[in-house]
């Protein structure tokens, strides 16, 4: 399953691990994703989304119906 937030569209980015001797090895930085169940009052059902912490704050602030939900790529 892809590691992409369904609200913000955040994805993993690449960077380097740096040792004490400043040797560089490639690594990936992953977004803080969680499966979370949200109540949709419009449809009176729960929706399970894979969202980042920032995506959860956006849902709390703006509401679930005002945000565009991106589909997960399988």
Curated annotation (Swiss-Prot):
Q: Return the HAMAP family for the record.
A: Ribosomal_bL28
Any GO molecular function:
structural constituent of ribosome
Is Ribosomal protein there in the keyword field? Answer: yes
Cite a single GO BP annotation: translation
Among the entry's GO cellular component annotations, what is one? ribosome
Matching entries from PANTHER family are given as: 50S RIBOSOMAL PROTEIN L28, LARGE RIBOSOMAL SUBUNIT PROTEIN BL28A
* Keywords, alphabetical: Ribonucleoprotein, Ribosomal protein
Q: Which Pfam families match?
A: Ribosomal_L28
Annotated protein name in UniProt? Large ribosomal subunit protein bL28
SUPFAM superfamilies (UniProt xref): L28p-like
> Can you tell which superkingdom this protein's organism belongs to?
Bacteria
InterPro entries cross-referenced by the UniProt entry: Bacterial_rp_bL28, Ribosomal_bL28, Ribosomal_bL28/bL31-like_sf, Ribosomal_bL28_bact-type, Ribosomal_bL28_sf
What is the species listed in this Swiss-Prot or TrEMBL entry? Buchnera aphidicola subsp. Baizongia pistaciae (strain Bp)
List the NCBIfam families hit by this protein, alphabetically: L28 (TIGR00009)
Q: Looking at the keywords, is Amino-acid biosynthesis present?
A: no
Gene of this entry? rpmB
Per the similarity annotation, which family is this? Belongs to the bacterial ribosomal protein bL28 family.
């Amino acid at each position: 399953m892809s590691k992409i937030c369904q609200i913000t569209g955040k994805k993993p980015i690449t960077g380097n691990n740096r040792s004490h001797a400043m040797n560089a090895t490639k690594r990936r930085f992953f977004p803080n994703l969680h499966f979370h169940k949200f109540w949709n009052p419009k449809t009176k059902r729960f929706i399970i989304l894979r969202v980042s912490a920032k995506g959860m704050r956006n849902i709390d602030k703006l509401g679930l119906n005002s945000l565009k939900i991106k589909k997960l790529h399988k």
